[in-house]
Structures are given as C-alpha cells and as structure tokens.
Amino acid sequence: MPSLERLIAEVEPNVITESLTRECIQIQGGEPDTAANKKRTMPFRDVECLAFSFKNLACVDNLRGLDTLTKLQLDNNQITKIENLAHLTNLTWLDLSFNKITAISGLETLTKLVDLSLFNNQIAKIENLDTLVNLNVLSLGNNQLSQLDNVMYLRQFKQLRLVNLAGNPICKSHDYRSYVLSHIKDLIYLDYRRVNPADVQAAREQHQDEMIELQEREEQQSQEEKLNAERESHEKLMKQANLEGVETLIDDMVKEDLEWPRLSQVPSLLDPWNEIRDKFNTYTDEFKVAILEQHNKKKAEYEEWLGVVRSYLDEKDAEARKLIVEYEKAKKRTARVVVDQPLMAESQIDNLKVKLMALKDQLMAIEMEAVEVLDGLVQEFDRAYSELAEINKGQYNGYFTQVRDLQNSFFNQLTSVAMTVFEKYNQENSDIESLPEEARTLLQDKDSLMNALQASHDAHMGKIDSLEDRLVSNELRSANDLTSSNATWATKRNRDRISEIINYLERNVLELEELAGEEEGGEM
C-alpha cells in the first residue's frame, strides 16, 4: 500500500524554492561536510549543476540568478510544459525525462545544449529545436511520435550523433530503422544500438530515389545560403565603409522616378540610358575601390593607435604594480615587527605611513604622465583620422560630380531624342495611334513631354544630391564620434584610476590605524 507521504505528494505538487534549490545543488568531489557547507552558502551565480529529480514538481519556475548553470536535471516529475528556462543560456545538459510534457517549446535560447533528454513524455511532434545547433545527444523515446517523416526534422543537426526514438508509434513501421539511418546523417547510436556503416549504406540504397531528390534540394539550399551569406557580408562591408546606397543608386533613381514608366512607353526615347548605365558602373567601381582602400587605412590607423595606447598603458601599469608590491612587502614586514618587536612598532608604523604617502605621490605622478601622453596620442589620432575623413569627403564629392555630369549628359541626350521622336510622330501619316496611350499623350503635347523630361531629371538629381549629403555627413559624423569617444574614454580612464588610487590610500590608512591600535593594545 502506498505510504501517506507519497499520497500527499501526489495530491500536492511541489514547487521550486530557495531551500529546495540549495538541497538540489550538485557538488563534484570533496568531503561530504565541505560539500554540504558549500550547498548552504555558495551564491546561486556560482552553481553549475542542479538535480531536481523525483521532487514532484508540477512546473518549472524560480530559477532566476542561476545563469551559469550548465547541467539541469528535472526528470521524474509532473511537469507538463517547458517554460522559464530562457535565461539559462549556458546549459549544455538538460534532462526532462519522465514527465507529462505534451509539446517541445521554450528551448530556443538554449543554444549551447549538447545533451537533451525528453524521454517518456507525451510529445507528438519533433519541433522548435532549430536553434540548438550544438545538439549531440537527443532522447525522445517513449513518446507519441506517429509520423515517420517527422524524423526528417532532425537532419538539420550537423552534430547529432546519438538519437533515441524507441517506444514511439513510428517504430512499428517496417521502414523505421532504414528511414532514420538514411535521413539523419552521421549517427553513431540509434535506440541504444551502435550504428553499422553497412546498415546506413543499405538504408540509403533502399531510399535512393528520395535521397537523390533530397540531396539535390540540400545542394540548392546550400548554394542559396552561401550566396545569401556572401551578399550579407558584402552589404555589411558597404555599410562599414560608408558606401551604402552607392551600388544601387542608378536603379534607385529609376525606381523613385514617377515619370520613368510613362517615358519608357515612348519608342527609343530612353535608349541613351544604357550608355549612361555602363559609364555609371565604371565610375562606381573605381569609386568603391578608392573608398574601400581608405576604409582599410582607417581601420589600420585605429588598430595601430590602439596598439600604441595599450602598450604604453601596460608599461605604466607594470610600473605602478611594482611600486605597490614593494609597499605591500613593507606592510607585511611592519605587521611582523608589531607582533615580534613591540618597542620598535611605533617607528616602523610611522615609516610605513611615510612610504604610503610617497607611494601615493608616485602613483599620482605616473597617472599625470599617462594623462599627458594619452592626451597627445588622442590629439594625434584625431588629426590623422580627420585627414583621412577629409580625403574621403573629397572622394565623395568627386564621384557625385561625375554622376551629376552623367545625369546632365543623359538629360541633354534625352531632350534631343525627344524632339526627334516628337517631330516623327507629329507628321502626317505617322503611326502614333499604334503607340500605348501614355506615349500618345506625351507625344501629342510638347509641353507635357518637356515637363515630364524635366520632372524625371529633377528626381534623378534629387536622389544623387540626397545620397551625397547622407554619405558625406556619415563620414564626418563617424570620424567625430570616434575621436570624441576616444577623448571620453581617456577622461573616464583617468577618473577611474584616480579613484582607485584614493581608495587604495584610504584602505591602507585604515589598516595602519588598526595596526597602531594593535601596537597600543600590546603595550598595555
């Protein structure tokens, strides 16, 4: 007969409390007494492993402050939903076996998970695991998985080596094992059994037609992903180099030109645009090369500057540490004198006070020198970087002047062609009626045609001017922001260092007062 305690536990589910959490902390190695004391006192932020097994938990909650947790056991409880785990982003091992979970959810942020057990639950579908790219071990045995093709979902996990699906309805299919082995790559263990390479080959041959089609799709997807990655990388570089919008300028000019669709209805009117486009592409390629070269120079300039700054500060920090170490040694010697030679204690403490004041002066002198040197380095970088920004500004102005000249040339050609076309279709016996309605409207009224051409030209010039203004402003602003942030950093570094020196001084003054008090107490 079940015990009273067990019946009560089944009726009244448990909840996670601080005391329960401490009880469930797992300490690796060490003496039992030491481990027990650590469980009682260690900060939650230092806990790496928790085991809530067999605690009759109905839900997952109250795990805040355990952000460094790497292993969490929640097996053999009454949990129905995976929740409140999103902040445990350092988890590599999670056991939710033997619960009442009906759906996989709430694991999206646990991207470091390597081992996940959902064994013996009520899960009907494999889903919502896409972000767990490091998954190596997955146990979904004894659930309610009934669709064999759902196993295909696991093909995306490149690190998956051990899978357990035993005890699910899908296992009753005569194709179950061959389907899993053919569709999940590089498995080493399936349902507690080591995978035989010969079985994998036989499974792939059995599902050959499907595998060929699948591999073709994956190859196409891989190519698309590669192209997307290259495009994203290129777009990122263009943005970093302040070239965003340059490559698409000519297309954007047309896209935002309300008159362009109407003008394109007039035969041969826009033919000069092809020549303009070719010249634009040539100018743009040359411009991109120049700006990217400047971009690399700016990066190199900043990295070189950072290297000089770090090297100098490391040198000054080493100098300061040496002085502090010497003082700390003197302090230890003085402390021993207070204990061993009370009659000499007072003079030794006075000497130590003198050394402390001298140390303060030395540290302050080092810091003042550092401030002066850093100020010079910041100003030097400001000048060098601003020069590069000004060179870039000239590059932008030169490029957009070329583009404007192209647009003006196109407008002149367009006007000339428009007059020729207008005269052609306004002669007797012209076939103007065969043209689209928009074209007829333009060619029947010279003013309308010229107004449309002018509006188109204005739209193009406006787009050119707008992009130039934006890029030049970005260039100068980013240079100003960087130099300003350097100056802000230098000021904050100085304040922090002065604060460190003062705090160190005050702390040691208190220690000397305590030491003097001990000396007086010893004399009494």
From Swiss-Prot:
Its main location: cytoplasm. Disruption phenotype: Defects in DRC3 give the dc3 phenotype characterized by reduced swimming speed, increased flagellar beat frequency and abnormal flagellar waveform. The keyword Nucleotidyltransferase does not apply. Belongs to the DRC3 family. PANTHER family: DYNEIN REGULATORY COMPLEX SUBUNIT 3, PROTEIN PHOSPHATASE 1 REGULATORY SUBUNIT SDS22-RELATED. Component of the nexin-dynein regulatory complex (N-DRC) a key regulator of ciliary/flagellar motility which maintains the alignment and integrity of the distal axoneme and regulates microtubule sliding in motile axonemes. Required for normal flagellar waveform. This is Dynein regulatory complex subunit 3. It comes from Chlamydomonas reinhardtii. The gene is DRC3.
